[in-house]
Protein backbone atom coordinates (compact mmCIF):
# COMPACT_ATOMS: atom_id res chain seq x y z
CA UNK A 1 0.00 0.00 0.00
CA UNK A 2 2.84 2.40 0.83
CA UNK A 3 4.28 2.07 -2.67
CA UNK A 4 0.93 2.96 -4.22
CA UNK A 5 0.51 5.99 -1.95
CA UNK A 6 3.92 7.32 -3.00
CA UNK A 7 3.10 6.70 -6.66
CA UNK A 8 -0.17 8.58 -6.24
CA UNK A 9 1.64 11.51 -4.60
CA UNK A 10 4.10 11.61 -7.50
CA UNK A 11 1.16 11.61 -9.91
CA UNK A 12 -0.56 14.39 -7.97
CA UNK A 13 2.62 16.50 -7.97
CA UNK A 14 3.07 15.88 -11.71
CA UNK A 15 -0.47 17.12 -12.33
CA UNK A 16 0.14 20.18 -10.13
CA UNK A 17 3.39 21.04 -11.93
CA UNK A 18 1.62 20.52 -15.26
CA UNK A 19 -1.12 22.93 -14.15
CA UNK A 20 1.41 25.66 -13.33
CA UNK A 21 3.46 25.00 -16.46
CA UNK A 22 0.36 25.45 -18.65
CA UNK A 23 -0.71 28.44 -16.58
CA UNK A 24 2.57 30.22 -17.30
CA UNK A 25 2.72 29.00 -20.91
CA UNK A 26 -0.55 30.83 -21.50
CA UNK A 27 1.23 34.02 -20.40
CA UNK A 28 3.92 33.72 -23.10
CA UNK A 29 3.91 36.25 -25.98
CA UNK A 30 2.26 33.99 -28.55
CA UNK A 31 -0.57 32.86 -26.27
CA UNK A 32 -1.43 35.50 -23.68
CA UNK A 33 -3.52 37.69 -26.01
CA UNK A 34 -5.98 34.86 -26.71
CA UNK A 35 -5.95 32.83 -23.53
CA UNK A 36 -4.77 34.88 -20.54
CA UNK A 37 -8.33 35.77 -19.44
CA UNK A 38 -9.33 32.16 -18.79
CA UNK A 39 -5.90 30.66 -18.30
CA UNK A 40 -6.72 29.30 -14.82
CA UNK A 41 -9.67 27.32 -16.17
CA UNK A 42 -7.76 26.08 -19.23
CA UNK A 43 -4.75 24.99 -17.18
CA UNK A 44 -6.94 23.25 -14.59
CA UNK A 45 -9.05 21.44 -17.17
CA UNK A 46 -6.05 20.36 -19.23
CA UNK A 47 -4.09 19.06 -16.22
CA UNK A 48 -7.16 17.33 -14.77
CA UNK A 49 -8.04 15.54 -18.02
CA UNK A 50 -4.46 14.32 -18.23
CA UNK A 51 -4.39 13.19 -14.59
CA UNK A 52 -7.66 11.22 -14.55
CA UNK A 53 -7.26 9.56 -17.95
CA UNK A 54 -7.35 5.73 -17.78
CA UNK A 55 -4.21 5.38 -19.91
CA UNK A 56 -2.14 6.76 -17.02
CA UNK A 57 -3.11 3.79 -14.82
CA UNK A 58 -0.14 1.65 -15.81
CA UNK A 59 2.39 4.38 -14.99
CA UNK A 60 0.80 5.15 -11.60
CA UNK A 61 -0.51 1.80 -10.35
CA UNK A 62 2.38 -0.32 -11.69
CA UNK A 63 5.00 0.11 -8.95
CA UNK A 64 7.97 -0.55 -11.24
CA UNK A 65 6.95 2.33 -13.49
CA UNK A 66 7.63 4.83 -10.74
CA UNK A 67 10.66 5.55 -12.93
CA UNK A 68 8.30 6.81 -15.66
CA UNK A 69 6.18 8.94 -13.34
CA UNK A 70 9.21 10.39 -11.52
CA UNK A 71 10.92 11.22 -14.80
CA UNK A 72 7.76 12.99 -16.00
CA UNK A 73 7.40 14.85 -12.69
CA UNK A 74 10.94 16.25 -12.82
CA UNK A 75 10.61 16.81 -16.58
CA UNK A 76 7.55 19.04 -16.30
CA UNK A 77 9.07 20.78 -13.27
CA UNK A 78 12.15 21.54 -15.37
CA UNK A 79 9.91 23.01 -18.07
CA UNK A 80 8.17 25.09 -15.39
CA UNK A 81 11.53 26.40 -14.14
CA UNK A 82 12.53 27.25 -17.72
CA UNK A 83 9.32 29.21 -18.35
CA UNK A 84 9.76 31.08 -15.06
CA UNK A 85 13.33 31.87 -16.09
CA UNK A 86 12.06 33.31 -19.39
CA UNK A 87 9.44 35.40 -17.58
CA UNK A 88 11.71 36.75 -14.87
CA UNK A 89 13.20 40.22 -15.13
CA UNK A 90 15.54 39.96 -12.14
CA UNK A 91 18.95 38.48 -12.88
CA UNK A 92 19.22 36.59 -9.58
CA UNK A 93 15.78 35.04 -9.99
CA UNK A 94 16.60 33.99 -13.55
CA UNK A 95 19.81 32.32 -12.39
CA UNK A 96 17.92 30.51 -9.63
CA UNK A 97 15.25 29.28 -12.07
CA UNK A 98 17.89 28.23 -14.60
CA UNK A 99 19.73 26.21 -11.95
CA UNK A 100 16.41 24.63 -10.99
CA UNK A 101 15.81 23.75 -14.64
CA UNK A 102 19.21 22.05 -14.93
CA UNK A 103 18.91 20.23 -11.59
CA UNK A 104 15.43 18.86 -12.29
CA UNK A 105 16.54 17.83 -15.79
CA UNK A 106 19.34 15.77 -14.24
CA UNK A 107 16.89 14.25 -11.75
CA UNK A 108 14.51 13.38 -14.60
CA UNK A 109 17.36 11.86 -16.59
CA UNK A 110 18.42 9.85 -13.55
CA UNK A 111 14.88 8.53 -13.18
CA UNK A 112 14.50 7.38 -16.79
CA UNK A 113 16.46 7.88 -20.00
CA UNK A 114 13.55 9.22 -22.07
CA UNK A 115 14.00 12.54 -20.22
CA UNK A 116 16.94 13.13 -22.57
CA UNK A 117 14.44 14.78 -24.95
CA UNK A 118 13.98 17.76 -22.58
CA UNK A 119 16.33 20.13 -24.49
CA UNK A 120 14.36 19.43 -27.67
CA UNK A 121 11.09 20.07 -25.79
CA UNK A 122 12.41 23.41 -24.52
CA UNK A 123 13.36 24.33 -28.06
CA UNK A 124 9.82 23.40 -29.15
CA UNK A 125 8.40 25.71 -26.46
CA UNK A 126 10.64 28.50 -27.72
CA UNK A 127 9.39 28.00 -31.27
CA UNK A 128 5.70 27.80 -30.39
CA UNK A 129 5.26 30.18 -27.46
CA UNK A 130 7.59 33.11 -28.12
CA UNK A 131 7.15 35.61 -30.94
CA UNK A 132 10.84 36.16 -31.34
CA UNK A 133 12.89 33.00 -31.32
CA UNK A 134 15.66 34.61 -29.40
CA UNK A 135 17.24 36.01 -26.41
CA UNK A 136 19.25 37.84 -29.00
CA UNK A 137 18.48 35.63 -31.98
CA UNK A 138 21.98 35.10 -33.36
CA UNK A 139 23.41 34.04 -30.00
CA UNK A 140 20.72 31.40 -29.57
CA UNK A 141 21.28 30.05 -33.07
CA UNK A 142 25.00 29.81 -32.37
CA UNK A 143 24.33 28.09 -29.06
CA UNK A 144 21.95 25.43 -30.38
CA UNK A 145 24.07 24.96 -33.49
CA UNK A 146 27.13 24.40 -31.33
CA UNK A 147 25.25 21.88 -29.18
CA UNK A 148 24.10 19.88 -32.21
CA UNK A 149 27.53 19.96 -33.85
CA UNK A 150 29.20 19.02 -30.56
CA UNK A 151 26.91 16.02 -30.07
CA UNK A 152 27.52 14.86 -33.65
CA UNK A 153 31.30 15.20 -33.23
CA UNK A 154 31.15 13.29 -29.93
CA UNK A 155 29.13 10.44 -31.46
CA UNK A 156 31.45 10.21 -34.49
CA UNK A 157 34.54 10.26 -32.26
CA UNK A 158 33.26 7.47 -30.03
CA UNK A 159 32.18 5.48 -33.06
CA UNK A 160 35.58 5.93 -34.74
CA UNK A 161 37.57 4.69 -31.75
CA UNK A 162 35.06 2.12 -30.42
CA UNK A 163 32.56 1.11 -33.12
CA UNK A 164 31.59 -2.05 -31.22
CA UNK A 165 30.71 -0.06 -28.09
CA UNK A 166 28.81 2.62 -30.00
CA UNK A 167 26.32 0.20 -31.50
CA UNK A 168 26.44 -2.47 -28.81
CA UNK A 169 22.85 -1.59 -27.86
CA UNK A 170 21.77 -3.19 -31.14
CA UNK A 171 22.75 -6.54 -29.65
CA UNK A 172 19.47 -6.35 -27.75
CA UNK A 173 17.70 -7.44 -30.92
CA UNK A 174 19.26 -10.89 -30.50
CA UNK A 175 16.82 -11.45 -27.64
CA UNK A 176 13.78 -10.02 -29.40
CA UNK A 177 11.34 -11.75 -31.76
CA UNK A 178 11.70 -8.85 -34.20
CA UNK A 179 14.46 -7.05 -36.10
CA UNK A 180 15.43 -3.38 -36.12
CA UNK A 181 13.69 -2.91 -39.48
CA UNK A 182 10.52 -4.60 -38.26
CA UNK A 183 10.47 -2.42 -35.16
CA UNK A 184 10.88 0.80 -37.15
CA UNK A 185 8.09 -0.24 -39.52
CA UNK A 186 5.78 -1.35 -36.69
CA UNK A 187 6.14 1.59 -34.30
CA UNK A 188 4.15 4.17 -36.37
CA UNK A 189 1.14 1.86 -36.09
CA UNK A 190 1.69 1.55 -32.35
CA UNK A 191 2.08 5.30 -31.76
CA UNK A 192 -1.16 5.91 -33.67
CA UNK A 193 -2.73 3.15 -31.56
CA UNK A 194 -1.62 5.10 -28.46
CA UNK A 195 -3.34 8.19 -29.85
CA UNK A 196 -6.52 6.24 -30.48
CA UNK A 197 -6.41 4.90 -26.90
CA UNK A 198 -6.16 8.45 -25.57
CA UNK A 199 -9.04 9.66 -27.74
CA UNK A 200 -11.18 6.54 -27.20
CA UNK A 201 -10.13 4.94 -23.88
CA UNK A 202 -12.65 2.11 -23.96
CA UNK A 203 -12.02 -0.55 -21.27
CA UNK A 204 -11.49 -3.35 -23.80
CA UNK A 205 -8.68 -1.35 -25.48
CA UNK A 206 -6.51 -0.92 -22.37
CA UNK A 207 -4.27 -3.75 -21.21
CA UNK A 208 -0.84 -4.57 -19.85
CA UNK A 209 -0.37 -6.76 -22.93
CA UNK A 210 -1.39 -6.21 -26.56
CA UNK A 211 -1.37 -8.47 -29.58
CA UNK A 212 0.88 -6.81 -32.15
CA UNK A 213 1.20 -7.94 -35.75
CA UNK A 214 4.75 -7.18 -36.87
CA UNK A 215 5.23 -5.04 -39.96
CA UNK A 216 7.63 -6.95 -42.19
CA UNK A 217 7.37 -4.53 -45.12
CA UNK A 218 5.56 -1.36 -46.16
CA UNK A 219 2.60 -3.48 -47.28
CA UNK A 220 2.55 -6.30 -44.72
CA UNK A 221 0.22 -5.71 -43.01
CA UNK A 222 -1.46 -3.23 -45.33
CA UNK A 223 -1.87 -0.66 -42.52
CA UNK A 224 1.92 -0.14 -42.28
CA UNK A 225 2.37 2.39 -45.08
CA UNK A 226 -0.82 4.36 -44.24
CA UNK A 227 0.34 4.54 -40.60
CA UNK A 228 3.75 5.88 -41.63
CA UNK A 229 2.17 8.44 -43.96
CA UNK A 230 -0.38 9.51 -41.34
CA UNK A 231 2.36 9.90 -38.72
CA UNK A 232 4.38 12.08 -41.10
CA UNK A 233 1.23 14.04 -41.96
CA UNK A 234 0.48 14.72 -38.28
CA UNK A 235 4.05 15.83 -37.63
CA UNK A 236 3.93 18.02 -40.73
CA UNK A 237 0.64 19.49 -39.51
CA UNK A 238 2.25 20.28 -36.17
CA UNK A 239 5.20 22.00 -37.82
CA UNK A 240 2.94 23.98 -40.16
CA UNK A 241 0.88 25.30 -37.22
CA UNK A 242 3.79 26.59 -35.12
CA UNK A 243 2.90 30.23 -35.83
CA UNK A 244 -0.83 30.08 -36.64
CA UNK A 245 -2.00 27.63 -33.96
CA UNK A 246 0.88 27.19 -31.52
CA UNK A 247 -1.14 25.19 -28.99
CA UNK A 248 -1.94 22.51 -31.57
CA UNK A 249 1.69 22.52 -32.71
CA UNK A 250 2.94 22.15 -29.13
CA UNK A 251 0.54 19.31 -28.31
CA UNK A 252 1.20 17.30 -31.47
CA UNK A 253 4.97 17.79 -31.68
CA UNK A 254 5.52 17.29 -27.94
CA UNK A 255 3.70 13.94 -28.19
CA UNK A 256 5.77 12.62 -31.08
CA UNK A 257 9.01 14.16 -29.82
CA UNK A 258 8.78 12.41 -26.47
CA UNK A 259 8.02 9.06 -28.07
CA UNK A 260 11.28 9.10 -30.03
CA UNK A 261 13.46 7.27 -27.50
CA UNK A 262 11.05 4.44 -26.65
CA UNK A 263 9.28 4.12 -29.99
CA UNK A 264 12.03 4.09 -32.60
CA UNK A 265 15.29 2.11 -32.83
CA UNK A 266 16.12 0.99 -29.27
CA UNK A 267 15.31 -2.75 -28.87
CA UNK A 268 12.62 -2.40 -26.22
CA UNK A 269 9.25 -4.14 -26.03
CA UNK A 270 7.02 -2.95 -28.86
CA UNK A 271 4.12 -1.54 -26.86
CA UNK A 272 3.46 -0.39 -23.29
CA UNK A 273 0.80 2.12 -22.27
CA UNK A 274 2.93 3.77 -19.58
CA UNK A 275 5.07 5.26 -22.35
CA UNK A 276 2.30 7.82 -22.92
CA UNK A 277 2.57 9.30 -19.42
CA UNK A 278 5.04 12.02 -20.42
CA UNK A 279 4.22 12.49 -24.14
CA UNK A 280 0.50 13.02 -23.43
CA UNK A 281 1.03 15.90 -20.98
CA UNK A 282 0.10 18.66 -23.44
CA UNK A 283 -2.33 16.64 -25.58
CA UNK A 284 -5.33 17.84 -23.59
CA UNK A 285 -4.43 21.52 -23.93
CA UNK A 286 -6.13 21.92 -27.36
CA UNK A 287 -9.24 20.21 -25.93
CA UNK A 288 -9.33 22.64 -22.99
CA UNK A 289 -8.77 25.71 -25.18
CA UNK A 290 -11.33 24.43 -27.69
CA UNK A 291 -13.90 24.06 -24.93
CA UNK A 292 -13.11 27.57 -23.68
CA UNK A 293 -13.50 29.01 -27.20
CA UNK A 294 -16.81 27.20 -27.75
CA UNK A 295 -18.14 28.28 -24.37
CA UNK A 296 -17.20 31.94 -24.98
CA UNK A 297 -18.80 31.80 -28.43
CA UNK A 298 -22.08 30.45 -27.04
CA UNK A 299 -22.02 32.92 -24.15
CA UNK A 300 -21.46 35.85 -26.55
CA UNK A 301 -24.42 34.71 -28.67
CA UNK A 302 -26.46 34.27 -25.48
CA UNK A 303 -27.33 30.74 -26.47
CA UNK A 304 -28.53 28.17 -23.92
CA UNK A 305 -25.83 25.75 -25.07
CA UNK A 306 -23.46 26.83 -22.30
CA UNK A 307 -25.26 24.63 -19.78
CA UNK A 308 -25.19 21.71 -22.21
CA UNK A 309 -21.46 22.22 -22.75
CA UNK A 310 -20.74 22.07 -19.05
CA UNK A 311 -22.94 19.01 -18.78
CA UNK A 312 -20.93 17.30 -21.52
CA UNK A 313 -17.70 18.31 -19.81
CA UNK A 314 -18.85 16.83 -16.50
CA UNK A 315 -19.96 13.68 -18.34
CA UNK A 316 -16.52 13.41 -19.97
CA UNK A 317 -14.67 13.79 -16.68
CA UNK A 318 -16.95 11.32 -14.88
CA UNK A 319 -16.51 8.83 -17.73
CA UNK A 320 -12.72 9.14 -17.55
CA UNK A 321 -12.83 8.75 -13.78
CA UNK A 322 -14.98 5.62 -14.01
CA UNK A 323 -12.68 4.26 -16.71
CA UNK A 324 -9.64 4.80 -14.47
CA UNK A 325 -11.39 3.18 -11.52
CA UNK A 326 -12.38 0.20 -13.68
CA UNK A 327 -8.85 -0.10 -15.01
CA UNK A 328 -7.47 -0.15 -11.47
CA UNK A 329 -9.78 -3.05 -10.61
CA UNK A 330 -7.90 -5.11 -13.18
CA UNK A 331 -4.67 -4.23 -11.37
CA UNK A 332 -6.03 -5.35 -7.98
CA UNK A 333 -4.09 -8.65 -7.97
CA UNK A 334 -1.64 -10.37 -10.27
CA UNK A 335 -4.26 -12.97 -11.12
CA UNK A 336 -6.89 -10.35 -12.05
CA UNK A 337 -4.32 -8.38 -14.07
CA UNK A 338 -3.21 -11.32 -16.19
CA UNK A 339 -6.73 -12.72 -16.58
CA UNK A 340 -7.64 -9.33 -18.00
CA UNK A 341 -4.57 -9.38 -20.28
CA UNK A 342 -5.33 -12.95 -21.40
CA UNK A 343 -8.77 -11.85 -22.61
CA UNK A 344 -7.49 -8.76 -24.41
CA UNK A 345 -4.37 -10.32 -25.96
CA UNK A 346 -5.48 -13.88 -26.79
CA UNK A 347 -2.62 -14.43 -29.26
CA UNK A 348 0.11 -13.61 -26.73
CA UNK A 349 1.73 -16.39 -24.72
CA UNK A 350 3.08 -14.15 -21.95
CA UNK A 351 -0.21 -13.44 -20.12
CA UNK A 352 -1.03 -17.16 -20.18
CA UNK A 353 2.40 -18.13 -18.86
CA UNK A 354 2.39 -15.60 -16.03
CA UNK A 355 -1.21 -16.39 -15.11
CA UNK A 356 -0.44 -20.12 -15.00
CA UNK A 357 2.52 -19.45 -12.70
CA UNK A 358 0.37 -17.30 -10.41
CA UNK A 359 -2.35 -19.94 -10.21
CA UNK A 360 0.16 -22.71 -9.53
CA UNK A 361 2.77 -20.99 -7.35
CA UNK A 362 1.33 -17.60 -6.38
CA UNK A 363 -0.30 -16.43 -3.12
CA UNK A 364 -3.75 -17.32 -4.48
CA UNK A 365 -2.70 -20.86 -5.48
CA UNK A 366 -4.93 -23.70 -4.29
CA UNK A 367 -5.22 -27.33 -5.26
CA UNK A 368 -8.43 -26.64 -7.17
CA UNK A 369 -6.58 -24.14 -9.38
CA UNK A 370 -3.77 -26.53 -10.39
CA UNK A 371 -5.70 -28.09 -13.26
CA UNK A 372 -6.65 -24.67 -14.60
CA UNK A 373 -3.01 -23.57 -14.34
CA UNK A 374 -1.82 -26.62 -16.29
CA UNK A 375 -4.46 -26.07 -18.97
CA UNK A 376 -3.50 -22.39 -19.34
CA UNK A 377 0.17 -23.30 -19.48
CA UNK A 378 -0.48 -25.80 -22.28
CA UNK A 379 -2.28 -23.06 -24.22
CA UNK A 380 0.70 -20.76 -23.67
CA UNK A 381 3.07 -23.47 -24.89
CA UNK A 382 0.98 -23.97 -28.03
CA UNK A 383 1.01 -20.23 -28.78
CA UNK A 384 4.77 -19.92 -28.20
CA UNK A 385 5.45 -22.71 -30.70
CA UNK A 386 3.52 -20.99 -33.49
Name the predicted role of every residue range.
Residues 1-386:
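Polytopic membrane enzymes that build or remodel cell-surface glycoconjugates and lipids
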Amino acid sequence: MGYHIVNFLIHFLSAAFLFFAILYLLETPNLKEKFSKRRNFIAFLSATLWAIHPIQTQAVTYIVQRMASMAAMFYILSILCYIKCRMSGASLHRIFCLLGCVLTFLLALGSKENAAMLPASLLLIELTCYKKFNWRFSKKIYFWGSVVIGVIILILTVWFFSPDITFSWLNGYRNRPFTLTERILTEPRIVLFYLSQILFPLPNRLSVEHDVILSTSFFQPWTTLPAILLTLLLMGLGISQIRKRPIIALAVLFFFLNHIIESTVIPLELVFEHRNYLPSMFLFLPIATGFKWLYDYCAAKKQPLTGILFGLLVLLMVSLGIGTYTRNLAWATEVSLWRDAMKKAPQSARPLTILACQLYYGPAATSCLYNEALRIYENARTLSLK
